[in-house]
C-alpha cells in the first residue's frame, strides 16, 4: 500500500490547557473513510471525525456519518504499536491490530493537523507505543522518505551499575537515534535531564581503577557520539567544573591507539595553563564563561583535533566566539580594565623582595592577559573591534606598552606586547591617532561650547606626540633588542604603521594618498608632483609644516583626512626617521661603539638589523610621498651607506638586500635619485659584487643580472615609445606654442643616461659577460652613439659631458661639478639652517653647499 503525499512539520509540545481540551474531544472535521479491500481502496462514506478519550482513558478515532449523525462509520482504538502515517497534507493512513488498512482523507489540512495533534497527545500520555510518521516522496521520485513526528524512543540505561553489555547497548542506541530528528531530540533531552554524563564519568573512574580496557574504549566512543550530536547544551555541560577532568580523561583512550593513551588531564592539572586571576574577578558568571571558553578551545584544538568534522568544529568555534564576545563586552563596561592598568601607574615597587617579585610577575601576567583579550577580539566584527581597541587606548594602553618596552626585560613578554600593538594597528592604522584627536576635540568642545572655531582645531602636539611615542618605541626596540622573533614583529608593526594605504582614520575606507602622490610624481613633466595641500613643493620645511588656525577651520572633510596623513608622515620624517635609520646615517656604518667589560670598543654592527633597515629604506622610498622620502634619503646620505653595504665584509644576504634596494630606487625612474647615484658613483659596489660572482651560478649573479635586465628593458621601451611618439607629434605644438618634439625624450631618459654611463664607466666588466644576451644589448645600446658626445650631453638636458676619471681600483669616479649646472637644478627641496643639525655629516653639508652655490650662480 502506498499513498504518496507531503509531510508537515513535527507538532510542537502543547501546553496544559490545550492538552486538557484534546483529552476530552476534538472539533469534528469532515473526512472520507477508506478501507483497503483486495488491494483497492473502498470509499465507505463521508462523515465527521473526532478524537476522543472515554472514561476508561482509552483513545479512539470516531467518524460519524454526514447524513446520519447517529450512525458511526468508523471507531478505531489507538493502541498497541500502531504506526500512523501522514501522507500529503490531508491523509492519515494506518493498519489496526486486526490487520485492517484504514485511511482518512480530510477536506482541509487544518482538520488533518488537529487529528495529528490528538495522536501526539495520546502517544505522550496514554499509549506510548503508538507512533506517527510523515511519508513523502524522495527527490528522485523513486521510493519515499519517512520522518518520525512522535513515537516510542529507546534510550540508554542510566543505571549506576554499568558494565560492558549496557555500554555496548547504549552506544548502539545513541548511534541509531541519530537517524531521525525526533529520536535525536528526545535522546538529547534525556542526556541533559537525567545526568547521564555523570553516570558515564562515575563508571569511567571505576573502570580505570579496575583496569577494564573494554569499558574505557566504549566510554570514549559514547562521549564522541554525544559530541557528534552537535548540540551546544551537551558541549557546554561537558566542560563544567565537575565534569571536564572526567571528559578529557575518557577521551584519553582511543580505539585507534589501543596500546597508548594521551595525558590531557596531566596537562590541564599540573603542567598546563590554569585559570589565573591577575585582577580578582567580582563577577562569578564571567569566571564560568572564561573557563568554558578555554576548555572548549582545548577540546577543539587538542583533544578532538583528529575527530571533529566540519559541523562540530564550526559549532564549537561559534560557541567560543559567543563566549569571547561576552568577555569583551564585560571588560568594556566594568572596572576590570581600570584596575588592571593601575598596575602600571606607579614606578615604585614593594620594598620586600618577595612582594616585589610577585608584583613584577603580576605585571607580566597583565600584559599576557591584555594580549589574550586583543587576540579574542579578532573574531569580532569591525565595529565591535574598533570599539574595544578605542576603550583600551582610552583606559591607558600606552602605560602598559611603555612598561613592556622600557622596563620589562623578558623578551617573551615584550613580544606579546608587540603582538598586541600589531593587532590593533593592522585593524586600523590610525585608530590610536584618531582616539587622541576625538578625546581632545571633546575636551575643547566642553571647554568652549560657544566658540565655533574651536570645534575645528587639531590637537597637533597631543596626537603627534602619541604617534611619535608609538613609532619611537618600536624603533628603539628594533635598534636595541637582538631577539629575532621580536625584531620580525617590530618590523611588521612598522611596515603597517608606515604604510600609507588606508590612512583615512575611520577604519572603513581606503585612501592611498602616498601612492597617488608617487603616481603623480612619476607621470608629470614637472619637477615635483602637483601635491601641495598649502605647501610649496619646491621648498618644503618639515619643521614648519602646519596650517594656520584659519586654514584648519576651513578644511573640507576629505582635505582634513589628507592633511592628517601628511602630518603623520611629516612627523615621522622629522622626529623618528633620524633615529630609526641612525645606523645608516652615521659615517661608519660597519662598526659602532659599545661598552665591553667596562671599556668602550668598536664592535661590528648587526647585519640582521641592517637587513631590516635597508628593507625599510626601500619601503619608504617606494610607498611614501616622493617629496618627503626623497629629501630625507638624499640629505642624510642613506643611499651612500646602502651602497657601501654591497661592497663591505657583510653576509651575502645583506649585500643582496642592498642591491635590491638600489634596484628598487632605480625602478622608480626618478631623475633625482638617478643623478644622485650617478654623481656619487654608487653603482661601483654593484659591479664589484658582479666581478666576484661573474662566473658563478648563484643568487648574487642572478640578482645583478636582473638589475641589468631592467635597465635594457626600459631602454628598449624608451626607444620604441620615443619613435612612435615622434612620428605622432611631428610638427605639433602645445598650448603655449612650444614644439612638442622637444619633449619626446623626457619619459625614460633616466635609463638611457644610466645605460650609457654604466657602459662608459664599467664597460670592461660588462664585456666579460657578453654571453648574457641583455648585457650584450646594453653594450650595443650604450655604444651606438658613443663617438657623438653631444647625444649623451643633450640627453641630460645639458651641454657638458660627465667626466669620468679612473681610480686606482679600476672603477670610475664621477665629479658632480662636471655636470651641467642646469641639469642639476635641485636634487631635493630647499635647505635652510642645516649647519647645526646633528643628523648631517660634513660631507653632506659640503655637498649641499656646492649644489646651493651652483644654483645661486645661475
From Swiss-Prot:
Segments of this protein annotated with the region Disordered: 1-23, 441-463
GO cellular component term of the entry, any: nucleus
Disulfide links within the chain: none
Ranges annotated as biased composition (Basic and acidic residues): 441-453
UniProt cross-references to Pfam families, sorted A to Z: EVH1_PP4R3 (PF22972), PP4R3 (PF04802)
Sequence ranges of Low complexity compositional bias: 1-13
Keywords for the protein's UniProt record, in alphabetical order: Nucleus
Reported function: Core regulatory subunit of the histone H2A phosphatase complex, which dephosphorylates H2AS128ph (gamma-H2A) that has been displaced from sites of DNA lesions in the double-stranded DNA break repair process. Dephosphorylation is necessary for efficient recovery from the DNA damage checkpoint.
Protein name: Serine/threonine-protein phosphatase 4 regulatory subunit 3
Native species: Saccharomyces cerevisiae (strain ATCC 204508 / S288c) (Baker's yeast)
